[in-house]
Amino acid sequence: MTIITIISGMYIYSLLSQDAHHSQYGQNTNLVLKKPIPKPQTAAFNQESTMASTTLLPSTSTQFLDRTFSTSSSSSRPKLQSLSFSSTLRNKKLVVPCYVSSSVNKKSSVSSSLQSPTFKPPSWKKLCNDVTNLIPKTTNQNPKLNPVQRTAAMVLDAVENAMISHERRRHPHPKTADPAVQIAGNFFPVPEKPVVHNLPVTGTVPECIQGVYVRNGANPLHKPVSGHHLFDGDGMVHAVRFDNGSVSYACRFTETNRLVQERECGRPVFPKAIGELHGHLGIAKLMLFNTRGLFGLVDPTGGLGVANAGLVYFNGHLLAMSEDDLPYHVKVTQTGDLETSGRYDFDGQLKSTMIAHPKIDPETRELFALSYDVVSKPYLKYFRFTSDGEKSPDVEIPLDQPTMIHDFAITENFVVIPDQQVVFRLPEMIRGGSPVVYDEKKKSRFGILNKNAKDASSIQWIEVPDCFCFHLWNSWEEPETDEVVVIGSCMTPPDSIFNEHDETLQSVLSEIRLNLKTGESTRRPVISEQVNLEAGMVNRNLLGRKTRYAYLALTEPWPKVSGFAKVDLSTGEIRKYIYGEGKYGGEPLFLPSGDGEEDGGYIMVFVHDEEKVKSELQLINAVNMKLEATVTLPSRVPYGFHGTFISKEDLSKQALC
């Protein structure tokens, strides 16, 4: 019965391919764009970043992947630890693939077009012949599988490879889904690194810095077999521990349900939410994944997420998060190493996914969070946890359609929820497009809801035209004007992280004022010059209260981070700290040094020298913007996402499970 499902799925895929007039990654046929079709651009990469390291990047995408994922490397190239995925994990050799099939078509190139090239759809007979030819001839089988499962695994691998092969012949990946672009240069993954102690330090580490700096990032375990976006990579946490002048470093995968199963299988089998779930191939991938589940080859019930985006320390738990799953509890050991305790549901209280940017009120120590659903209502829920970890009932937020909500904000009394113009429309996949689309007819708005609300009846929606903030840095109340002030980076084109564009991406630090009395809004740029500012924070001890300073990454030239900026939110004054020629970093983390001035503290940031292929952690005085100390790291640290700092006192109170 299931074999019939497989063949039927292939047949449907073939028919859909014959009817397709647009690329699976192409334009949405039902949307009208007033602006010219933008140039291929991604929030994670541009052409300059793709060519950043000539020692790593061959002339074609397939050559790049074949070279960098091979088990050997030329002695003429820098011996980066990421050049082979046959590295050991937790000192254990990777498991022999349980149903790895032969490689797909090797011809691939990077295209700058949103349109599909003219092609002749493959015949059904040709597709079946390709399936037969691609059935693996290996004798390596997972002993845990019974004969039916082994046969099903080989057939399913062959079907998947045939589909991918045909797609590559039809058109190349766009840059937003091309592995050779998305994991090029220092975005390329690294193997785990057990803890290394007594790292060399230049300068002096301030005595007040006691604890561990942890930062999350995407680090794919396996070579992608199809489309791949930076956000699709497996989560890896990098940790630098400070203990009375001694500094250590370690990096470990977060052992998600997805990663554990794919390690056993020896290949990626879970669908990649951004890089693969586009168009007809995305539909077929979902069908194949469901069929694998029917045969017991995969178990999605333990979660699908990668836990690669955010980190928060709450109630004795360090939580690694991505918005497609529950968080994962990661422990920092006494030696400074990292261990995954498992998927964390707050003692059975959390039944749904949670976004990667929960907020902790610095005074009450409560945690506030959202959960969104792209398939069924309610599309959005709000909830909170007391400082002891007790969850409130869910508050269903009324939305007409599922919306991309990566971040939100809190004030002393309110939560501020964005409902913007980037939405999920799964039927777009049937038309050959992306399920993540920009809806220009929709009006962006912010909802203001009391933190302790038991339902959404009192929520006040205020429109903010043409506003898409991927991140919100802070928000506060100004009672004298009946306004809620929101500080965020407004991004244009809004969907450029997910879909290709010709238009150059801009991220404008903005002040948005929401008048609770009139129901009107205003928006203005905080600084006069156009500088892309993304990834950063304010003093976390003042979150939800009025702050003067924000510390944000200088994503120039986009998408690389050449330094960070200390921005005076009241005057617009900007002070820049530049890492130096050929050096790039990521999110600057502000660590307060005490209860003194708001900017009293230090900036921590990973910096990578692309010429020397070496990474370091820099500590910068946030008051005078001078370098205090540099920690030389034992291995390369890829560019990543968000981090946090856990004090020595909090480390001593870690939960055991």
UniProtKB/Swiss-Prot annotation:
Highest taxon, organism lineage: Eukaryota
Positions bound to Fe cation: H357, H406, H471, H642
Knockout consequences: Plants exhibit abscisic-acid-deficient phenotypes in seeds, but not in vegetative tissues.
Record note on cofactor: Binds 1 Fe(2+) ion per subunit.
GO molecular function, one term: 9-cis-epoxycarotenoid dioxygenase activity
Induction context: Low induction by drought stress.
One of the protein's GO biological processes: seed dormancy process
Disulfide bonds, paired cysteine numbers: none
Reactions catalysed according to its record: a 9-cis-epoxycarotenoid + O2 = a 12'-apo-carotenal + 2-cis,4-trans-xanthoxin; 9-cis-violaxanthin + O2 = (3S,5R,6S)-5,6-epoxy-3-hydroxy-5,6-dihydro-12'-apo-beta-caroten-12'-al + 2-cis,4-trans-xanthoxin; 9'-cis-neoxanthin + O2 = (3S,5R,6R)-3,5-dihydroxy-6,7-didehydro-5,6-dihydro-12'-apo-beta-caroten-12'-al + 2-cis,4-trans-xanthoxin
Keyword Protein biosynthesis on entry: no
This protein's GO CC annotations: chloroplast stroma
Swiss-Prot/TrEMBL keywords: Abscisic acid biosynthesis, Chloroplast, Dioxygenase, Iron, Metal-binding, Oxidoreductase, Plastid, Transit peptide
Subcellular location(s) per record: Plastid, Chloroplast stroma
Listed cofactors: Fe(2+)
Reported tissue expression: Expressed in developing siliques, embryo and endosperm.
This protein's record includes keyword Transit peptide: yes
The protein's Enzyme Commission number: 1.13.11.51
Family, as annotated: Belongs to the carotenoid oxygenase family.
General function of this protein: Has a 11,12(11',12') 9-cis epoxycarotenoid cleavage activity. Catalyzes the first step of abscisic-acid biosynthesis from carotenoids. Contributes probably to abscisic acid synthesis for the induction of seed dormancy.
Protein name: 9-cis-epoxycarotenoid dioxygenase NCED9, chloroplastic
Record organism: Arabidopsis thaliana
Lineage of the species this protein comes from: Eukaryota, Viridiplantae, Streptophyta, Embryophyta, Tracheophyta
